[in-house]
Amino acid sequence: MCKSLKIATVVLMVILAAAFKPTKPATRTEAPPDLQLEGGRRLSYERSFSSENEVKPKRGFWSRLVDIVAGEPDFHSMVRPYSVVTDSRGRVIVSDPGAAGVHIFDFADKKYKFLSRADNIKDPMLTPQCVAVDASDNIYVTDSEAGKIFVFDASGKYQRVIGSLKGGEGYFKRPTGIAVDAKAQRIYVTDTLRDKIFMLDMQGSVLQTFGKNGQGEGEFNYPTELRLDGDNLIVVDAMNFRVQVFDRSGQFRFAIGGIGDSTGTMFRPKGIGVDSEGDLYVVDGLWGMVQVFNRQGDLLYYFGSRGTEAGEFQLPTGLSIDAQDRIFVVDSFNRRIQVFHFYGAGKWSHAGGSQ
């Protein structure tokens, strides 16, 4: 009896010691310095995140004790993230082809959800590519392999699919970029292999297409991501190494970029976004940077370089800018999202304090 009690005491002490064992400090890289811009503007690095473990509340003592005995629970982490968008609730929604699903990070309510192929056995997601949201925070996901657009409600519940690979109306070869015009009730989709932009109604019927293969104005060579901004539809024309801007009816307005090996040109344009001052952000996947242009096509500044430290990227892809000018960049091969903050004129004083 005494021997059994001693053994039990030793086991308990080992468990308690493990529960309170000081953890080795995680290696933290120093944040890059703020980028001081013209007119008192400023770009700051905020943080990065990569898994559900960074959203949910920290586990208490008894939960950690159970983890030691039963093993730590599995947490969803990014595998090969590609596209990102934020909704009106401040949630960050990330497509992850490597995980065959979509991550929803809700930092305000400390919640996380993963949308996967198992959510709809009959018509599963295969390779989720790009994500968009509408005014009601419904989530739209293009699937480049299935040739469809998957629609979920704001809670993440599957609603329906749009399009197919089988021909007929809504026939896609490789749907990639997507944007939703909530006011006009329109959905815009790039079909990368057909070099076209589809304009759909909210039920998925095709209203219009525009574009063809070529290098001229309004022509495409491997179009990928797109964004709506005001009256503009902005399209990444990847293999023409540029970004083209149209009105919402598909009429060409202007283009930015061109192939080259110097700043202001593009080699692998990926994600795009527009800040509150109307400047255009373009991710270059090969160079591992984000370039920022004005509407005249002039390069204003850039940030990032190739690497694994904070503020560095390994094959970055998607980009999204929220209403507070926080910039979310998909750092794909580093398996994380990096967050920056642009402080425009009037949002930051020359003394360095908030106004």
Language model regions located:
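Bacterial N-terminal signal peptides that target proteins for export
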Residues: 1-9
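Short intrinsically disordered, low-complexity segments
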Residues: 12-13, 43
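Hydrophobic h-region of N-terminal signal peptides that target proteins for export
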Residues: 13-20
